[in-house]
Structure formats: C-alpha cells, structure tokens
C-alpha cells in the first residue's frame, strides 16, 4: 500500500471503523511502517463531551485522549500491514504506565506520537505520547489486539 501523507479524516475512516462522535483523529502527518506514526486532533468546544465535562470549565476527558492514542496505535498497525482487511479489527487490549501531565482544553491541538515496541501473534505493544504545544499532556504504553470478526 502506497501511503500518501497527510491522510485526512475521510481517509482515516477507510482504515479504522470509528465514526462521529468517536473518531478522535483528524489527520495523519507522518508514518514509518512497523515503527512510528504521528497524528493530530484539533480539540473544539463543539464536541459533545464538553456539554458535561465540564460546562463552566471544559476539559478534554483523559479517557478520550487515551482512546485517541489507541486509535493512532491501531492505525499504525493497519497501515503497516498494507491497509484494513475486511472483517479485521484492532481492539484496545491494555494500558500501562498512563500519566496525565496537563489538561487539554478547547482550542488545543493534540499531536499523537506512537511507536511500535513489539508485535507478536496479533498483539502490538506501543509507546504513545499526546502533546500540546510541544509539552507532554498524556503518555502511556498501549496494547492492541488484532481480531477477525
């Protein structure tokens, strides 16, 4: 599969099954097969989670940042295998060493940098970092498992 960068949201949807309001990636900006992927998400006040988290102090929920990091990891795995195959999914399988270093608010641009650490029998282990303005907001080790359904 020839990967042309950047990969925009409409084409990300051809790679991963997530859709609004759960698709958390806006663009893939860098990719090295079986190694690294960089993606971005523009955080806007129009996103549904900000109606309740929190109305007077909107803060991006940490679990959604982790989900976005997992989507980036799954996208790295799928692109590394040449694209999405029918009935094949990469599921979020685990998380270790998660640390939340700064709040993410509407107007921020999240930059996700994910690196494949190991891949064995359909399970990938990734180092994932989410940054805002070059500062680490969230970091974690994420596992994704491939499954045919």
Swiss-Prot record:
This is 3-hydroxyacyl-[acyl-carrier-protein] dehydratase FabZ. It comes from the Bacteria. It is found in: Cytoplasm. The active site is at residue 53. It comes from Neisseria gonorrhoeae (strain ATCC 700825 / FA 1090). The lineage of its organism: Bacteria, Pseudomonadati, Pseudomonadota, Betaproteobacteria, Neisseriales. Involved in unsaturated fatty acids biosynthesis. Catalyzes the dehydration of short chain beta-hydroxyacyl-ACPs and long chain saturated and unsaturated beta-hydroxyacyl-ACPs. Pfam families: FabA. It catalyses: a (3R)-hydroxyacyl-[ACP] = a (2E)-enoyl-[ACP] + H2O. Belongs to the thioester dehydratase family. FabZ subfamily. Its EC number is 4.2.1.59. GO terms for molecular function: (3R)-hydroxyacyl-[acyl-carrier-protein] dehydratase activity. Keywords: Cytoplasm, Lipid A biosynthesis, Lipid biosynthesis, Lipid metabolism, Lyase. Its main location: cytoplasm. InterPro entries: FabA_FabZ, FabZ, HotDog_dom_sf. One of its GO terms (cellular component) is cytoplasm. It is an enzyme of class 4 (lyase). GO terms for biological process: fatty acid biosynthetic process; lipid A biosynthetic process.
């Amino acid at each position: 599969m020839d990967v042309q960068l950047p990969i925009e949201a409409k084409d990300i949807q051809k790679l991963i099954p997530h859709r609004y309001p759960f698709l958390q990636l806006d663009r893939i900006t860098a990719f090295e097969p079986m190694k690294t992927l960089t993606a971005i998400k523009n955080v806007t006040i129009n996103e549904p989670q900000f109606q309740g988290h929190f109305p007077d102090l909107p803060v991006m929920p940490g679990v959604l940042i982790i989900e976005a990091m997992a989507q980036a990891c799954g996208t790295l795995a799928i692109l590394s295998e040449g694209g999405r195959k029918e009935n094949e999914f990469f599921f979020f399988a685990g998380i270790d060493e998660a640390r939340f270093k700064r709040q993410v608010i509407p107007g921020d641009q999240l930059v996700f940098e994910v690196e494949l650490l190991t891949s064995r029998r359909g399970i990938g282990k990734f180092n994932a970092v989410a940054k805002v303005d070059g500062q680490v907001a969230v970091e974690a080790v994420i596992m994704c498992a491939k499954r045919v359904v």
